């Protein structure tokens, strides 16, 4: 069984207000994407990495991230699509998976603080079950709202905030994405596509520091998290 990390990094980062895409912004002198890839590069149970980025940025990604930082597990840099879901399908089609039971970890390129232990647990669960979704319990009260009016308050104990990685056996996630593409269905995450197949996705406890860096405020948090991580080493 091979374990492959599929890392979508094709977002335009409009909310960041920067001149370059968010995945290439520097965090202590190193692109965010490089911090993320380093986690998979150092994880002994991960065999391969595929990065998905806008087609025009493939040469930049190869030179300034993959080659500059010496990521030996990166097998390919794949052109992304219009939506994240299209990008992931492109990545799945590019993976050299000879066995449908090979495991694929799908992880956002701008989530550099995922603990290795969470990755390992995700692989274990995905191997035994239909899939593994990393998530954390909601801390805040959640409201449903229509036209500016509160319409309900879901029980907080049932609300979990989805993160990545979302991890599946290759045959399951490939089938889910191909079906969604054929039917023109656009989901909010990879797990939702697997759920449409009638499969049961199991939750793996995540980490509240596993943030998706999309705004300037997130960058401030990320800098603080990185200093904390460095001080613990």
From Swiss-Prot:
Keywords of the record: Isoprene biosynthesis, Nucleotidyltransferase, Transferase
Enzyme Commission code(s) on record: 2.7.7.60
Pfam annotation, one family: IspD
Pathway(s) the chain acts in: Isoprenoid biosynthesis; isopentenyl diphosphate biosynthesis via DXP pathway; isopentenyl diphosphate from 1-deoxy-D-xylulose 5-phosphate: step 2/6
Keyword Disulfide bond: no
Keyword Nucleotidyltransferase annotated: yes
Site annotation Positions MEP for the nucleophilic attack: residues: 156, 212
Molecular-function annotations in GO: 2-C-methyl-D-erythritol 4-phosphate cytidylyltransferase activity
Catalytic activity, reaction form: 2-C-methyl-D-erythritol 4-phosphate + CTP + H(+) = 4-CDP-2-C-methyl-D-erythritol + diphosphate
UniProt-listed SUPFAM superfamilies: Nucleotide-diphospho-sugar transferases (SSF53448)
InterPro entries, per database record: IspD, IspD/TarI, IspD/TarI_cytidylyltransf_bact, ISPD_synthase_CS, Nucleotide-diphossugar_trans
GO biological process terms held by the UniProt record: isopentenyl diphosphate biosynthetic process, methylerythritol 4-phosphate pathway
Function as written in the Swiss-Prot or TrEMBL entry: Catalyzes the formation of 4-diphosphocytidyl-2-C-methyl-D-erythritol from CTP and 2-C-methyl-D-erythritol 4-phosphate (MEP).
NCBIfam families attached to this UniProt entry: ispD (TIGR00453)
Protein name stated in the entry: 2-C-methyl-D-erythritol 4-phosphate cytidylyltransferase
Organism: Geotalea uraniireducens (strain Rf4) (Geobacter uraniireducens)
